Amino acid sequence: TTGTVGSSLTGSYGNLTLNSDGSYSYELDANNTDLQKISTGEYLYETFTYTITDEAGQTATAQITIRIEGINDAPSAVNDKETLDLDETSEITNFDDSSKYVKANDTDVDQMDNISIDSVRSGKTNESGSSITVGSAFTAQYGSITFFADGGYNYTANSGLRDSLKPGEKIYEYFTYTITDSKGLT
């Protein structure tokens, strides 16, 4: 692609503006998915070739190479919902089905980053309810739950809960979890 001095030239990862005095500016394309994938310690390079001409019409060609250093992006958590039909069972166990883990739909754009469950609380927000220790059973309002760092969990409804509900009655139990990537961002 050919550009004009003083105008923006679009590259693979951003836009370069080269001025007639030799100065230049480079602006990254924040929406570029390739840029989002690189993590701390990883690099991408973008090279632009330019030609200069002197008053006698003599030309020379050179290159500007931009080194783009990756940064650690925070992971993104997505709300999960599980339904327990007490007419069928009193327990939710998903140890053997990772597609049902709470972190199965959570992501981190850094390709090599691993996500783990860092903390859990009872309630709808991080500020509400009680702290739950990952890996330990917690007695909640309607049952007992154990969350695991890999996103698996086990929930067992309280004994007698089924008999205490009216036909068709629905109750809700909320838990809030925080995920952390391998570099400590949540």
Describe the residue ranges of each PLM region.
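Extracellular ectodomain surface segments
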Residues: T1-G11, A60, A74-F138
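Acidic, turn/loop-rich segments in luminal/extracellular domains of secretory-pathway
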Residues: V5-G70, S131-T186
